[in-house]
Amino acid sequence: MTVVIPEYITPLIPWVRGIVGLVLIGVIFMGAMGAVWLERKLSADIQTRMGPCRVGKYGLLQLVADAIKLFTKEDLKPLNADSLLFNNANIFMLGSVFLMLVALPVGAVFINGVEYPLAVTQMDISVLYIEAVSALSIFGIFMVAYGSNNKYSLLGAFRNFARMVGYEVPLGITVISVAAMTGSLNIVDISTAQGLHWNIFLQPLGCFVFFVSLMADMGRLPFDQNESEEELIAGWITEYCGMRFGLGFFAEYIHMILGSFLVALLFLGGWNVPGFIANNSFFGIIVPTGFLIVKVVFVLMVIIGLRWAVPRFRIDQVVDLSWKKLLPLALLNLVWAVGLGLYLGA
């Protein structure tokens, strides 16, 4: 997709991208806080209890109270911990999600019929870039586990590594399948090309494989073997407390938000609205991004609901599911996607 930009706007592009980047960081942080609240309230509804309701209207200020609690807790460090690894691990975990945000559009606006994606930058290989930098968080997890000098933390990190190695392969194959059918590795082009023909209907098998692999990549139930409380206390994050724990916890929720955006952009049509024609500036700014956010919230609710619907798998079951079930399905979907792409002339 090529957008013709007037010459007088060209010098302002770096400033606009910087402002958009700062705004997106704030929006994603607020979205992660909203995801925490949504999970607690939805989990409470599933379990027929009230959930957060004491601090603020509908418990909305409970997150502020939790943040104050974490800020005021003492920052403890194990006696035999490696200070360099232990203190800097959060940089990799937060850096991973922020690097994803650079190429991930969180919406689009239509001005005079021209589409302007809300992204810091557009890359021709943005899908591969996002998948690559999302894997950097494993370095932070290993730094925490090894630097903590704790057997439970290290075992949790080993489980995380075994899971990620298995599920990154089918995840990558499904991404390539979508790109092959669309004819582009640019996530903006993939979202725009769907129109009314969403990829979830053209590649239902690919959507299933991608979603399951994404759940494993995020470490959500039933794939949270790296921090299963009954076996490993808190897994790789056992020795973290205070804001160190808070930042690691927060990075997981930001990752979940960005993963939901990926599902919506790759398979649910992105910001495309059925029957919507961007001939009005006001609706062209509000409607597409709002529709994408609705899809993201829906995906979040599915992820949260599965936590209470599916039991945790054993680590051997997780590995078998990846290599023996999802990988063949991903390859089958790739053949289907290539054939469909040739038929559609991608």
Swiss-Prot record:
It is found in: Cell membrane. Its EC number is 1.5.98.3. The chain crosses the membrane at residues 18-38, 91-111, 125-145, 170-190, 196-216, 257-277, 284-304, 326-346. GO terms for cellular component: plasma membrane. It is a multi-pass membrane protein. It catalyses: methanophenazine + reduced coenzyme F420-(gamma-L-Glu)(n) = dihydromethanophenazine + oxidized coenzyme F420-(gamma-L-Glu)(n) + H(+). Its main location: membrane. InterPro entries: F420H2_dehydrogenase_H (IPR053455), NADH_UbQ_OxRdtase_su1/FPO (IPR001694), NADH_UbQ_OxRdtase_su1_CS (IPR018086). PANTHER family: NADH DEHYDROGENASE SUBUNIT 1 (PTHR11432), NADH-UBIQUINONE OXIDOREDUCTASE CHAIN 1 (PTHR11432:SF3). Belongs to the complex I subunit 1 family. This is F(420)H(2) dehydrogenase subunit H. The lineage of its organism: Archaea, Methanobacteriati, Methanobacteriota, Stenosarchaea group, Methanomicrobia. The gene is fpoH.
